[in-house]
Design a protein with these regions (language model features):
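Non-catalytic signal-transmission and effector/linker regions of two-component phosphorelay proteins
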Residues: 1-4, 13
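Conserved acidic carboxylate
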Residues: 7-8
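Two-component/phosphorelay signaling modules centered on CheY-like receiver
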Residues: 11-33, 37
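Conserved phosphotransfer microenvironments
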Residues: 37-40, 50-77, 87-90, 95
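Active-site charged/polar residues at nucleotide-handling catalytic sites that mediate phosphoryl
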Residues: 46-47, 106
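Output/docking surface of receiver
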Residues: 87-114
Length: 114
């Protein structure tokens, strides 16, 4: 069973993703409450997380820069953890392009469009 930490601004989307992953019985999912993005480091280290799925947006706690900074810190603590970013390519095409670049630069393992 894989441990996944989900950190999203949109609570409804976070709940839906967590529910879908849990139903497969292949994943144990922990969610970080909106606005509590600082909890990601300690929660991922405590589990330890196999995958960290995070939403990126223009809001300060969810920016690509802050997410990549967290990934850099977590990579040192949990070398086997995989990182996936979720973004809305329709409402912010430039942010979506930056996420694709982060994948091409191998700073993240995967990205998803919402």
């Amino acid at each position: 069973m894989k441990n996944i930490v989900v950190s999203m601004q949109n609570t409804l989307l976070s709940e839906a993703i967590a529910h879908a992953l849990t139903e497969t019985r292949e994943f144990r999912v922990e969610q970080i409450l909106p606005g509590r993005t600082g909890d990601a480091l300690s929660l991922c280290a405590a589990m330890p997380a196999d995958i960290l799925l995070m939403e990126v947006s223009r809001l300060s706690a969810y920016t690509l820069e802050s997410r990549l900074s967290l990934i850099d810190r977590l990579s040192a603590k949990i070398p086997g953890c995989k990182f996936a970013l979720l973004c809305d390519e329709n409402s912010d095409p430039e942010l979506a392009r930056q996420v694709v670049c982060a994948r091409q630069d191998r700073r993240i393992d995967a990205f998803l469009y919402a």
